[in-house]
A protein has these predicted regions:
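N-terminal glycine-rich cofactor-binding segment that shapes the pocket for flavin-like pterin cofactors
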Residues: 1-358
C-alpha cells in the first residue's frame, strides 16, 4: 500500500490549521524505544495544545518487521513488550511533577530539580534512566487509542486505552464486544466510561437512496481482486496466493483464515470463497456500509448506536477528499437536529472531547 507518508510530521501542520479538533496518528511500538516515543508524543501534545492522540499498534506483519531488519515476535511476546513499553512511557511522562516548572528569573531557575526525577527502569525488554527531556504536556501524555480484537488486544485496551476502534459486522457481535470491553475496563480498576468504544462504519451518501446504492455499487466494483488479495494477505500475514480463489474459506484449517471467514459469514450470512472474501475486504475491510441519503444514514447510525450502546463511530471514507466533507455537511447537521451530536466543544483537549457526553 503506497504512498503511505509518515503521519507524525503532518500532525504539526494540521495543528497549525485547527484549534479544537483532536489529532491522532498510528505509531507502532514494535521497532522503537519508549524514551523516543514518550518524547515524540509529549512534544506533539505540546504542539497541538493537548489535542494529540496515539493509536498504539504492535506490528503484526513479517514484511513490516523485515523493513527494520528484524523478525516478527510471537503474539504473546509482542503484547508483553507492549505493556512494558506503555508503562515506561507513563513513568517518563510522570518524571516531571505538575509544578516542576517554576520559571524563576531572579533566581535563574527554570525547573525545581527536586521535582524532576529519574525513573531507573530496568525490565525484560527495556532500560531507561530518565527523566524525560520534555516538560509535562497539557494532557500529561497523549490520549491512547487502540484497535484490539484478540483477547490480548482487548485486555491491553481495557488497561490503557482512552478509546478503542472496533470492526463488528452486526448488532449482536457489537453488543457482545461492547460489554466485554466495558467489563474488562472495570476489572482493570477504571470506570467503564474511561475507555470509549468507536465502531467502524463506511457511510456512502446520495441525494436519493437509489443514487447512494449506485455509488456504493460503483465503489465496490472499482476494487481489483488483486488489490483485495494483497490487503487481506497483509492483514492476515499469510500468503494467499497458494490457495485456490474459489476454495471455500470455511474449509480451510488455518487459524487466520477461520477468523476472517467468521467475520464475513457474520456480515453476509453466507459461506464465502477466498475470491469473495478478498473482494469484500478490499471494498471495506469488513466495515458496515451504511448507504442512503443523509437522513437514511442517520437512521442507520441511530439504530446501531441505540441497540449496541456504543460511544461513537469511526468513519472510513470511500474516497478522499470529499467523502468526509459530505458526511460533515449532510449527516452531522441531521444528527444535530435530532439531538444526537454536539453543537460545540465543552473542553479543549482530546481527552475532554472523548469524555464529552452528547
Amino acid at each position: 500500500q503506497a504512498p503511505e507518508h509518515d503521519p507524525i510530521p503532518l500532525l504539526g501542520f494540521m495543528a497549525a490549521a485547527t484549534t479544537r479538533i483532536g489529532l491522532g496518528a498510528t505509531f507502532s511500538i514494535s521497532h522503537a524505544h519508549p524514551f523516543y516515543a514518550a518524547r515524540l508524543w509529549a512534544t506533539l501534545d505540546h504542539l497541538t495544545r493537548g489535542r494529540a492522540a496515539w493509536n498504539v499498534v504492535t506490528t503484526l506483519n513479517h514484511n513490516q518487521s523485515a523493513n527494520y531488519g528484524e523478525t516478527l515476535r510471537p503474539s504473546d511476546e509482542r503484547y508483553e513488550r507492549a505493556h512494558e513499553f506503555i508503562e515506561v512511557c507513563r513513568k517518563l511522562w510522570d518524571s516531571w511533577e505538575p509544578d516542576a516548572v517554576v520559571m524563576d528569573r531572579e533566581a535563574g531557575v527554570f525547573a525545581d530539580p527536586k521535582k524532576v526525577h529519574r525513573i531507573e527502569h530496568e525490565g525484560r525488554f527495556f532500560k531507561s534512566r530518565g527523566p524525560l527531556n520534555v516538560i509535562r504536556s497539557p494532557q500529561h501524555g497523549p490520549a491512547i487509542l487502540q484497535a484490539g480484537t484478540s483477547p490480548k488486544g482487548r485486555s491491553f485496551a481495557a488497561r490503557y486505552a482512552d478509546a478503542i476502534f472496533a470492526i463488528q459486522p452486526n448488532i449482536a457481535g457489537a453488543r457482545a464486544y461492547y460489554d466485554d470491553i466495558k467489563r474488562g475496563t472495570v476489572e482493570e480498576g477504571r470506570p467503564a466510561e474511561a475507555c470509549k468504544i468507536l465502531f467502524g462504519i463506511q457511510p456512502i451518501l446520495g441525494r436519493t437512496d437509489a443514487e447512494a446504492r449506485e455509488k456504493a455499487e460503483h465503489h465496490n466494483a472499482l476494487v481489483p481482486l488483486e488489490g483485495g488479495l494483497a490487503i487481506l494477505s497483509g492483514h492476515l500475514d499469510f500468503d494467499l496466493s497458494q490457495i485456490p480463489l474459489d476454495a471455500l474459506m470455511a474449509e480451510r484449517t488455518e487459524a487466520q483464515l477461520q477468523r476472517m471467514q467468521t467475520r464475513y459469514r457474520t456480515l453476509t450470512g453466507e459461506l464465502l470463497t477466498l475470491r469473495e472474501v478478498a473482494q469484500r475486504h478490499g471494498q471495506s475491510v469488513g466495515l458496515v456500509q451504511m448507504v442512503g441519503t443523509a437522513s437514511a444514514v442517520a437512521d442507520q447510525m441511530e439504530d446501531y448506536f441505540d441497540k449496541v450502546g456504543g460511544d461513537g463511530f469511526m468513519l472510513s471514507p470511500i474516497y478522499s477528499p470529499g467523502a468526509i466533507e459530505e458526511f460533515v455537511d449532510e449527516v452531522v447537521p441531521e444528527l444535530q437536529r435530532r439531538g444526537r451530536y454536539r453543537r460545540d466543544y465543552t473542553g479543549t483537549t482530546q481527552r475532554d472531547h472523548l469524555m464529552q457526553e452528547d
